[in-house]
Amino acid sequence: MQYLFIFLGGAVGALLRYLLSFINTSFEMPIGTFIANLCGAFLMGFLGTLAIQYFNNSPMLKKGITTGFIGSLTTFSTFQFELVQFFESGSFILLIVYALTSYIFGILLCFLGVRLGAKIS
């Protein structure tokens, strides 16, 4: 049954990730991937913290949200591939800006998610 929750959460996260990828064509920097990863970082902190409090008796739902939905929404491999593309095209400034903003804001948003989740629970 746990696999079903992961599958359903994954389907929703993957669809949202796919829809966000359309934003990538409008900017020099892959904004869709950036948004997906930052939202995922915040949600992992927020929902991960809430899951400890509210979903502790439902590990299937917790896995569906974290592993399924957030896992398929975020995309570390696409992020790495985009960094390599910047490198190969000689766009070193974009590479550095994209990497640093993704990591720094990702950590900050995850931290904020944890703090907000702790306040609510």
From Swiss-Prot:
Catalytic reaction annotation: fluoride(in) = fluoride(out)
Major place of residence: membrane
InterPro entries: FluC
S-S bonds: none
Regulation: Na(+) is not transported, but it plays an essential structural role and its presence is essential for fluoride channel function.
Function in brief: Fluoride-specific ion channel. Important for reducing fluoride concentration in the cell, thus reducing its toxicity.
Keyword Metal-binding found: yes
Keywords from the UniProt entry: Cell membrane, Ion channel, Ion transport, Membrane, Metal-binding, Sodium, Transmembrane, Transmembrane helix, Transport
Molecular function in Gene Ontology: fluoride channel activity; metal ion binding
Name of the featured protein: Fluoride-specific ion channel FluC 2
This protein's GO CC annotations: plasma membrane
Membrane topology of the entry: Multi-pass membrane protein
Record's subcellular location: Cell membrane
Taxon lineage: Bacteria, Bacillati, Bacillota, Bacilli, Bacillales
Organism encoding this protein: Staphylococcus saprophyticus subsp. saprophyticus (strain ATCC 15305 / DSM 20229 / NCIMB 8711 / NCTC 7292 / S-41)
GO biological process: cellular detoxification of fluoride
Binding site for Na(+): G71, T74
Membrane-crossing segments per the record: 3-23, 31-51, 64-84, 92-112
Similarity field: Belongs to the fluoride channel Fluc/FEX (TC 1.A.43) family.
